[in-house]
């Protein structure tokens, strides 16, 4: 019997022992031998030491990652890593950042988390929210402690010492909580995943865990983090963040801040709320910015590249100041460095950074469907269309504005935001073409808004009214996204009335006016309704800038240049048919017969 009791109650391991074992599992699953050697070398060169403990401080991490002071993001990052380093014993946060803790941090902060977290990005989103959040305890529970999964009773002395001495900005309580009231049922799975790696068999006892309420990410902290993530979006692991320092001064900094504000507006109304709730956080990130935290990859994988292991560097080499290759080879009125980084939050950066080129600009080539067609239709790779302008007044002013309003159904929706400056865009994967009978595009088409609120409207897989390009004398010449094709069979409708899709963007054929329609209560459109603004709204605006950018490399650019050259030669050949013979009088007579010159311009009528 004594033997049986011994088997039923194995010796329990301390937090520290389990943490070291989990760190070892993370290391073996997520790092190569060379990467871990580099991490140890970097840690050794940076760590401070107190007694026998070697650890990383906030200013050390900020300095090594080269986080610009002007962003104010260093305390936010240190709050995150001090929390994530406690995984899976999150009730112990904030913790001293020893090497095992840094292993946890780097795995969770980079794409390497996919091999160790059961639900991948969903688990990581939960952890990142908690690492950013401020937790308020109910007064009656302020002294309660959260039992860990194994009901361990051995204290972790070093972690308690850190809690007493911690001055991490952003923590509202000494001990960060392990519960988010919106998602309690998923907590067991997240923690158990880690304990399964450790072969800890005891069940998670959440019955006595204190409940947290009003867990929120402070708005200002998230604003600072957004600016850092936008700056780091194109960062390669072996690149230095300081290469992008020109983008945090002067007008570039103001542009970065403005872009961050547009994204922040999707998460919270900064004027009326002080924080972001988890339920909203987890529901909109997969839709409007699934790549939001990808900037952490290049930032934190920096720890895995030791300068002492740079075999391309010679001993007596003089350091050379590097300059980041520009993300854009052309300048645009809408698309700039910050806007491109914003778009990379929901489209792959590998298709955008240093791979887009300006195909069409209305202010350069003219606002007409003909010039649009000439510049865009020969591009055989994905494109980005961007349009910006100023909201029209509710009462039309001037003849053209009145005519545009008359072509639309009576406006019955309010505006979608307070700002009058609007920017929308569409990602089109298929090559452009005329839509004589049906729309073109596929389920990878994305409709989005960049300003003043960042919003994304993914394509439906059922309704395929993605893109319409119809020129006169079509029933309704226009460029639209998400609208039914204007078939002649619809002539029984009012001849001058456009049919707007539930979620759609429509530009008139002169590219002078546009309308974005969001009928949230309606279903079945080509694009899904907003996950941010769950109400009906409509934006009518005067177009000020219209751009189309080609996404692709040099091969696509060469192919388009060849097609352009061929079409130009063909057009020139058509112009020279029976001309250029040297007989000016004969050429003139031929043109007069065609009705192209001369006073009569009869065109050679036989009547």
From Swiss-Prot:
GO biological process: one example: response to oxidative stress
- Cellular location(s): Cytoplasm
What coarse category fits the chief subcellular location reported for this protein? Answer: cytoplasm
Alphabetized UniProt keyword annotations:
Cytoplasm
Record-annotated TLDc domain positions? 333-552
A cellular component term from Gene Ontology for this protein is: nucleus
Glycoprotein is among the record's keywords: no
Q: Which family does it belong to?
A: Belongs to the RTC5 family.
Q: What does this protein do?
A: May be involved in a process influencing telomere capping.
Please identify the protein, giving its name as recorded: Restriction of telomere capping protein 5
* Taxonomic source organism: Fusarium vanettenii (strain ATCC MYA-4622 / CBS 123669 / FGSC 9596 / NRRL 45880 / 77-13-4) (Fusarium solani subsp. pisi)
Origin organism lineage: Eukaryota, Fungi, Dikarya, Ascomycota, Pezizomycotina
